[in-house]
């Protein structure tokens, strides 16, 4: 069969889109166009990707909901030394509560001001650019532990690859695969990684078929 000779191993539906008359398309031409298609796979639109990679934008009701944190968590800040560490920790916890992921030390100023007011800190004393990576990593562990989540580590990657592999066998629409693996990781209480990790995972698996 034609597909037995095509090293790019792409699904038949794409081939049918490229040409309605298979006898007029060479194996090499199909592989070239299929390869070009795979190289240009785009799952989320630019706007969707930016939204996924950015902290949530809350309205006033959502802000109260997600930044109303349990006493056991807010009490953790008593041992933190600086206003920046205290506020950034609580904002990070609120973002995680809403989205099950962290946002690489990105914070909306309105959220910093809201949390600062809650705990009696002057917002001007909060400097997110001085919230260092090591402190942020320690805070992530506290937040993950409180919410009962695990980080997206090597074991999580193996699990995600297995799940995506099963999805790719029955679903060729990459966006649906992405949305589903997000739900699977959330149900397993695994913190979501960034978009590029999921994008690479899915496209690598798709390219194997």
Predicted regions and their residues:
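Cysteine-centered motifs
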Residues: 6-8, 19, 31
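Long amphipathic alpha-helical coiled-coil/heptad-repeat bundle
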Residues: 30-209
């Amino acid at each position: 069969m034609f597909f037995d000779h095509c090293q790019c191993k792409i699904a038949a539906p794409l081939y049918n889109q490229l040409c309605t008359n298979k006898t007029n398309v060479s194996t090499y031409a199909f592989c070239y166009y299929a390869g070009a298609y795979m190289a240009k796979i785009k799952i989320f639109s630019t706007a969707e990707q930016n939204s996924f990679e950015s902290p949530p934008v809350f309205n006033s009701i959502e802000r109260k909901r997600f930044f109303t944190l349990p006493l056991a968590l807010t009490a953790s800040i008593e041992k933190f030394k600086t206003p920046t560490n205290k506020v950034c920790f609580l904002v990070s916890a609120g973002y995680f509560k809403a989205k099950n992921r962290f946002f690489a030390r990105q914070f909306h100023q309105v959220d910093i001001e809201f949390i600062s007011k809650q705990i009696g800190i002057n917002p001007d004393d909060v400097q997110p650019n001085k919230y260092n990576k090591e402190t942020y990593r320690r805070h992530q562990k506290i937040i993950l532990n409180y919410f009962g989540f695990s980080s997206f580590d090597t074991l999580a990657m193996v699990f995600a690859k297995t799940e995506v592999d099963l999805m790719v066998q029955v679903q060729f629409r990459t966006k649906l695969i992405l949305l589903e693996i997000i739900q699977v990781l959330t149900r397993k209480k695994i913190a979501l990684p960034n978009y590029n990790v999921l994008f690479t995972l899915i496209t690598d698996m798709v390219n194997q078929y």
